């Protein structure tokens, strides 16, 4: 459970100034973090475990339901063999080792497929680093694969996971990739290359090389998120970036020399997009070393399947249902729904193409669809006499199947919705919050206003005890039917205190309907 700020322990940090070789600084930092560790706070480790368990629930569910991208990538991985001298990686639900980079791609794709695992909007107000780049806790399979290869125990593996989250989280605070049409997973690829190379024993030169290769050769663009209907490439973006990050790390460890000092390279993406004097990168980078001085405390949980920038609107509906109990039972009486949101959310989940989704990937990034489906779920709950809250309204895979996407009731509700840009007052509150308001004009109840919602449940600044309860419930619902015993699975994948042997086989549990390899 994320602890309140008052219960966190202070911790030291390391600053990598803009006028230094930050790629080499990251390499030094990664080696020190793993091989000369300072104690990490209990709050940080507990939060990290929860994000990892949450990601496993998402991945298991996607595979059990036959989601296309992770199934294709898992099949590809299971057809591969580890390199000579390698222990290989383990795919979710299989026991036979596979090529490391392919196993990582398969597992990361499964984790990300539902778009329901942890998220961040790079923001550290206390340090004035508020670039607000997106990111997700997609890259834990990189840590698991590196741990299996290096023979790490559970506590050491947690440090590799934390290292990945820290590097990508801090990069998200200082460099907004989206402004340059670059996909947010690139920060995760940089973090994965550094952490993987360090965990496998790479020296500073090898780690710097791996980082340089990822930046010079493998930059993903947001083309995967444009167009009327989104494809498998959207959900698999992190997986494919993790795959090349691991390949870059292993290639560098084998002696390949990639570009050095990549953050100050005038033709690399950083200075190319943000021109600055020779000898400088566009940003300072400060990274946690111990205590609870880590970016993970600014990361958020999703309480179901939805693009996280819609969470403010979902919280607004929950609040309105509590305030006006009759609303949930009568969505037909809604004459108009007006939602005011901020940029960049307005351009991402409210563009005109999102009003008529036909694929799951488009529906879970469509604010109109998410709200319409929630209104229909609320009506079903109201028929039982209950007031719909987050528990009852949790969006799950069935809410995005073909039948529900094509439901005429969805289209009818979307036709009464208007999503507007809330303007500077809303924009200024992001990325600290998810500023949203919902106003409903109802035939029986008149004008209903949610007021401004900034920190919905699941947000790092929301009620953490309530969030924890719902995240646990989400895990149970996602893996129900996919494994024999959800509680046993939750216990199995917690890493603290686990042996080297436990870690090596952590994901080798049966999943109903999956090829055991």
Predicted regions and their residues:
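Terminal-appendage/accessory-domain detector
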Residues: 2-132, 233-243, 250-517
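Residue-level detector of well-ordered alpha-helical segments, enriched
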Residues: 47-51, 138, 156, 160, ...
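Conserved, well-structured ligand/cofactor-binding cores
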Residues: 49-50, 127-140, 149-158, 183, ...
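Well-ordered alpha-helical scaffold segments within catalytic/enzyme domains
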Residues: 59-62, 142-150, 193-200, 248-252, ...
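Short connector loops/turns at beta-strand edges and beta->alpha or beta->beta junctions
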Residues: 139-140, 166, 216-220, 288-292, ...
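Glycine-rich, mobile lid/loop segments that gate access to catalytic sites or pores
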Residues: 147-243, 247, 261, 266
């Amino acid at each position: 459970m994320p602890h309140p700020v008052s219960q966190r322990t202070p911790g030291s940090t390391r600053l990598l100034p803009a006028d230094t070789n930050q790629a080499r600084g990251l390499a030094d930092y990664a080696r020190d973090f793993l091989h000369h560790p300072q104690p990490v706070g209990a709050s940080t480790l507990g939060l990290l475990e929860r994000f990892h368990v949450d990601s496993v629930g998402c991945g298991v569910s996607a595979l059990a339901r036959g989601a296309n991208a992770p199934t294709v990538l898992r099949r590809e991985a299971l057809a591969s063999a580890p390199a000579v001298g390698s222990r290989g990686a383990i795919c979710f639900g299989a026991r036979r080792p596979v090529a490391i980079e392919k196993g990582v791609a398969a597992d990361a794709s499964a984790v990300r497929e539902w778009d329901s695992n942890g998220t961040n909007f790079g923001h550290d107000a206390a340090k004035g680093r508020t670039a607000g780049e997106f990111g997700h806790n997609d890259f834990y399979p990189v840590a698991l694969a590196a741990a299996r290869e290096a023979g790490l125990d559970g506590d050491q593996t947690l440090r590799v996971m934390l290292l990945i989250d820290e590097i990508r989280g801090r990069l998200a605070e200082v460099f907004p990739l989206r402004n340059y049409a670059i996909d947010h997973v690139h920060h995760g690829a940089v973090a994965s290359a550094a952490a993987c190379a360090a965990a496998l024993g790479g020296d500073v030169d090898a780690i710097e090389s791996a980082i340089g290769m990822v930046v010079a050769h493998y930059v993903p663009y947001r083309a995967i998120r444009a167009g009327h209907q989104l494809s498998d490439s959207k959900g698999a973006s992190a997986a494919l970036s993790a795959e090349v990050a691991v390949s870059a790390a292993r290639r560098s460890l084998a002696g390949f020399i990639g570009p050095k000092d990549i953050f100050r390279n005038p033709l690399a993406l950083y200075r190319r997009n943000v021109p600055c004097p020779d000898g400088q990168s566009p940003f300072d980078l400060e990274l946690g070393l111990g205590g609870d001085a880590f970016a993970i405390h600014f990361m958020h949980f999703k309480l179901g399947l939805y693009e996280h920038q819609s969470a403010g609107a979902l919280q607004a509906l929950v609040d309105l249902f509590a305030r006006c109990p009759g609303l949930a039972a009568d969505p037909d009486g809604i004459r108009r729904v007006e939602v005011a949101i901020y940029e960049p959310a307005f351009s991402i989940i409210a563009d005109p193409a999102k009003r008529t989704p036909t694929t799951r990937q488009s529906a879970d990034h469509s604010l109109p669809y998410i709200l319409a489906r929630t209104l229909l779920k609320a009506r079903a709950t109201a028929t039982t006499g209950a007031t719909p809250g987050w528990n009852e309204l949790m969006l799950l895979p069935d809410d995005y199947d073909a039948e529900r996407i094509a439901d005429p009731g969805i289209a009818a509700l979307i036709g009464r919705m208007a999503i507007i840009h809330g303007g500077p007052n809303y924009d200024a509150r992001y990325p600290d919050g998810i500023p949203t308001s919902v106003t409903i004009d109802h035939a029986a109840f008149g004008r209903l206003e949610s007021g401004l919602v900034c920190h919905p449940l699941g947000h790092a600044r929301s009620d953490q005890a309530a969030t924890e309860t719902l995240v646990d419930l989400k895990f149970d619902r996602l893996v129900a039917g996919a494994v024999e015993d959800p509680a046993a699975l939750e216990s199995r994948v917690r890493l603290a205190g686990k042996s080297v042997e436990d870690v090596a086989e952590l994901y080798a549990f049966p999943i109903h309907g999956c090829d055991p390899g």
